């Protein structure tokens, strides 16, 4: 999918979303979660305290990240660990964000999204002027959709089922087999921590 398709997909999934929610989406797609991480204990504690929306599903973002619902079945410690490991600065994040903003402006100016072009441009100008700070979901979005997720890098997706199995069963002895460059070392490193 391209940026236009990702934005349309967000609008289809959340038809009552506001411009602010799309800005959050493209921000997360570009920067990931680097702005949210402080330390492991704080991240884990926040996950444990957050209400869980049982209807959440994995959402692919327009970049290297996914929104993993808290209801997925991972322990708070595993999710916190994946979240922190995903919080590395993204290369060219600002440029990626600005490319996505141009696509968004085109969609709005072509009346493909239900936002005022003038108002959107004013909001985007102010956002840029402020240095593109991270956004929260709108109150409308929070009330209607109850978002409950953490961003993680999509390189961890192939291992999520295994992590869930380990988290929801007894400790396991695991043998990792596979072809060259299939992710054995990455998985072993993740499991060791």
Language model: regions and residue ranges:
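Short hydrophobic/aromatic beta-strand immediately N-terminal to the Walker A/P-loop
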Residues: 173-175
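Long, basic/Gly/Ser/Thr-rich N-terminal segments
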Residues: 1-140
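Conserved lysine of the Walker
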Residues: 184
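Hydrophobic positions on the alpha1 helix immediately C-terminal to the Walker A/P-loop
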Residues: 187
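N-terminal pre-Walker A segment at the start of P-loop NTPase domains
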Residues: 144-169
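Post-Walker A helix-loop "phosphate-sensing" segment adjacent to the P-loop in P-loop NTPases
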Residues: 192-193
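P-loop (Walker A) phosphate-binding loop of NTP-binding proteins
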Residues: 179
């Amino acid at each position: 999918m391209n940026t236009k398709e990702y934005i349309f997909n967000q609008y289809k999934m959340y038809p009552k979303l506001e411009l602010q929610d799309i800005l959050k989406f493209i921000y997360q797609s570009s920067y990931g979660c680097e702005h949210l991480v402080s330390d492991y204990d704080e991240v884990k504690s926040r996950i444990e305290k957050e209400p869980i929306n049982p209807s959440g599903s994995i959402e692919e973002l327009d970049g290297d990240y996914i929104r993993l619902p808290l209801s997925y079945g991972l322990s708070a410690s595993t999710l916190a660990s994946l979240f922190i490991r995903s919080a590395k600065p993204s290369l060219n994040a600002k440029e990626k964000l600005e490319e996505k903003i141009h696509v968004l402006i085109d969609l709005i100016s072509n009346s493909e999204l239900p936002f005022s072009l003038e108002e959107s441009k004013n909001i985007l100008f102010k956002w840029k002027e402020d240095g593109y700070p991270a956004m929260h979901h709108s109150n409308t979005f929070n009330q209607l959709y109850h978002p409950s997720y953490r961003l993680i890098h999509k390189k961890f997706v192939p291992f999520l089922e295994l992590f869930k199995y380990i988290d929801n069963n007894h400790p396991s002895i695991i043998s990792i087999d596979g072809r060259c460059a299939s992710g054995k070392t990455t998985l072993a490193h993740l499991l060791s921590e």
